[in-house]
C-alpha cells in the first residue's frame, strides 16, 4: 500500500448558454475560491430530450477544477447562479495528477 495521500481534487462539468454567462459563472467561482481554475470551451453542441422534445443547443462547456471540501458549496453556488432550471452538474473524481499542479490547486482554494 502506498504512503501517498488520496487525491481530493475533482473536476466538475457544467455547461453555460453563452460566453458571457460562462465568464460570469467562472469569475464568481474564482472570486469565492470555490474553484482553483475554470476552463471555458466554447462551441460545444448539446443534444438532449427536454419535456419530451429533442433539443439541440450551442453551449460553452465549463471544466471546473476544485476539491472535495469545496464540492458541495460549489454545486449549491452554481445551482443558485445558473440560468438553467436543471444545469449540467457532474462531479468527476481525480485519481491522480502532477503533484506540482495538485499542490497549486489545493493552495489556490485556501
From Swiss-Prot:
It comes from Pectobacterium atrosepticum (strain SCRI 1043 / ATCC BAA-672). GO terms for biological process: response to metal ion. GO terms for molecular function: copper ion binding. InterPro entries: CutA_Enterobact, Ion_tolerance_CutA, N-reg_PII-like_a/b, N-reg_PII/ATP_PRibTrfase_C. Keywords: Copper, Cytoplasm, Metal-binding. It is found in: Cytoplasm. Homotrimer. This is Divalent-cation tolerance protein CutA. Binds 1 copper ion per subunit. Involved in resistance toward heavy metals. Cu cation binds at residues 14, 82. Its main location: cytoplasm. It holds the Pfam family CutA1. GO terms for cellular component: cytoplasm. Belongs to the CutA family. The lineage of its organism: Bacteria, Pseudomonadati, Pseudomonadota, Gammaproteobacteria, Enterobacterales. Its cofactor is Cu cation.
